[in-house]
Amino acid sequence: MLRYSLKRLLSLAISLIIASLVIFLVIEVAPGDPASFMLGINAQEDTLNALREELGLNQSKLERYLSWTFGMLQGDFGTSYTYRTPVADMVQDRLWVSLPLAIYALALSTLIAFPAGIYAASRRGGLGDVSIMGATQLGVAIPNFWFAMMLVLVFAINLRWFSAGGFPGWDNGLFTGLKALTLPAIALALPQAAILARVMRSSLLDILNEDFIRTARAKGLTPRQALWRHALRN
């Protein structure tokens, strides 16, 4: 077990190093000079050189990569070229909205997917199964941004049940904050719910074909009883 864990950790470390190299190289080959972008095209050359020195852009690529990597390990993600503020501070500020949104979307997708997958598996080949599988196929095929636009159009612009944009902040109350996150959470949850529902249905159908389910049915259990008492536990 220890050997397996060490191999997995080594594999993870190698993957992270490769990913960091790819990200760094993509940024390096991108056109443009960060100093010129931050100061504008009319900036004086001595001002540009001073900013390049401050940002470490005059260092070699290897030095910049090592500085960037060790900085990330210490929680220093550098300075945003656009906002000229520490990236860690920007991430922290937005995390108070992004993390609850992700949890909200995960909860919604689970609440939608599990009942849909269970119902589809219990009605295999029936109208309910076909309808749910058709809906999940649409959910997988249609991108999130289209769902988001339709939700805003219907529920924010036409019905005016929700705000069309912006986040009021948690200072205005938990209900107000969650209400503002509802439409984005639904837009994120629907495609994930479609995938989870299909996985749930497929897993249940595999279990329903197992020998212990046949044994339970032979003992007199109805298909629904076998599903709820045995299949869902596994």
Where are these regions (language model features)?
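Membrane-water interface at transmembrane helix exits
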Residues: 23, 27, 31, 35, ...
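Alpha-helical transmembrane segments of integral membrane proteins
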Residues: 2-4, 13-16, 93-130, 144, ...
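An internal, D/E-rich "acidic patch" concept
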Residues: 58-114
